[in-house]
Regions:
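A conserved active-site cap/scaffold subdomain adjacent to cofactor or substrate pockets
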Residues: 42-114, 118
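C-terminal core of ALDH-fold dehydrogenases
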Residues: 124, 133-157
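Conserved NAD(P)+-binding/catalytic subdomain of aldehyde/semialdehyde dehydrogenases
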Residues: 1-77
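Hydrophobic side chains in well-ordered alpha-helices
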Residues: 27, 62, 91, 130, ...
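Short hydrophobic/aromatic-enriched beta-strand-loop microsegments
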Residues: 37-42, 99-103, 138, 156-157
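Short active-site oxyanion
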Residues: 12-15, 76-78, 115-117, 136-139
């Protein structure tokens, strides 16, 4: 609202664009209907996160990233791709443990049950290929050797 109206330090903008939650969409609708500024006409769907992970990152950190996104809405996708089969079960256990203490666990649990997935890929090339075919809004590379995944162009946004 401040960007649409302007403040003492920020001049009012002509247009607000980009994705956001249902509350952002509502705010954009209000500023448009009030004639304060323009907005793009795109309607955005649910968000998603894709974690590219390996054993150099704690399964608790990976699980936390997936849970943090999923607690926003029951229709959020939380995806992890790894080439470490042992890590898959560790992440699953960590998700289960962390959900027990989460205040909004009902929403996160529903989201993860419906749209949460951990995918095994045989190598880095396959990981990038799967990630690019999904084209998620958010990508996290959770690896000490993150540069090997950034040499190409990960599709995200």
């Amino acid at each position: 609202m401040a960007l649409a109206s302007g403040t003492k330090k920020v001049k009012a903008v002509n247009k607000i664009v980009g994705a956001g939650s249902k509350w952002v969409a509502l705010a954009k609708k209000i500023v448009f209907l009030e004639g304060l500024c323009g907005v793009e006409s795109a309607n955005y769907g649910p968000s998603e996160i894709l974690c590219i992970a390996d054993s150099s990152t704690s399964p608790d950190i990976i699980a936390s990233s997936m849970i943090a996104q999923s607690e926003h809405s029951p229709d959020v996708m939380s995806i992890c791709i790894t080439k470490d089969r042992k890590l898959i079960n560790k992440i699953r256990r960590s998700i289960k443990d962390q959900l027990q203490d989460l205040p909004r666990n009902r929403i996160a649990r529903k989201s993860l049950n419906n749209y949460g997935i951990i995918i095994y890929a045989k190598d880095d090339k396959k990981i990038i290929s799967i990630s690019d075919s999904i084209g998620p809004e958010h990508v996290e590379v959770l690896s000490k050797n993150y540069k090997r995944y950034l040499s190409g162009n990960l599709v995200a946004g």
